[in-house]
Amino acid sequence: MHPIPVLHGMTLGELAQMIVGEQWLDIDASSYDNAKLTVVPVQDYQRTAHYSLPVAPSPNLPNDLSIRLYPTLCFFEGTDVSIGRGTDFPFQLIGHPFVEFGKTKIPVNANSAAPHPKHENTLLSAHVFSYADPSNLEGSDSKQTTHKRSPISGLDIATLIDAYSRFSEYNKVISASDASEETFFTRPDFFDKLAGTDALRYQIQAGKTPAEIRQSWQKELSKFREKRKAYLLYEDTD
């Protein structure tokens, strides 16, 4: 596992230079000595510029909104919460058959992008994100691309904490033998893999606030920001 933040603020070329420069790959030193990495800078590129990908990077990332939400919603893959696989809104909603996330009911069915989706053949109580109004579906055509402000920004810890808290009520109505923390963290090892360590999961379970969790990152984040300076090709706006 390389010491890279979920949102590292680097282009692929810059990141490639950093991986080689810091010798993060599990290869012998002579291979690094012989490595010939060439990164060609893009003329007039601006780090703050917005652009749409010409080709969807995944069948489950069909538009700009899903890509912007991915840094947060990907963590739900380690939980019992659906992020829309098997619906018309992959990575554009959070929902569950028995825990209320919104009044909108969204069916989950297998499709080519999700042959075995979580909570298949059920109706999700879902919160569907959109640029116009996060509380409803209007204007959130899954084929639409836009540069409007995303309903949540970056890695939104509050969204994870809110979802976790909703399961406390769910735990009260299921049988005592099933009532455990794992009603939410159903794939704890995978959640920890996505986060890099088990620290984030334990912080959420311990009731830490978003501010407290973010503060715990600052020391290592500062080290990364300082280290990456040597590999940046474009003006740093962070």
Where are the regions a protein language model picked out?
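Flexible, low-complexity junctional segments that flank or bridge functional domains
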Residues: 218, 222-232, 236
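Conserved, well-structured core segments that form the ligand-binding/active-site neighborhood
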Residues: 1-40
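Glycine-rich, aromatic-lined ligand/substrate-binding cores of catalytic
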Residues: 32-38, 42-122
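Electropositive phosphate-/nucleotide-binding environments in soluble metabolic enzymes
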Residues: 9, 13, 194, 218
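Surface-exposed patches in mature extracellular/periplasmic domains of secreted proteins
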Residues: 30-32, 213, 234-235
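Conserved functional hotspot residues or short segments at active or partner-binding sites
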Residues: 89-217
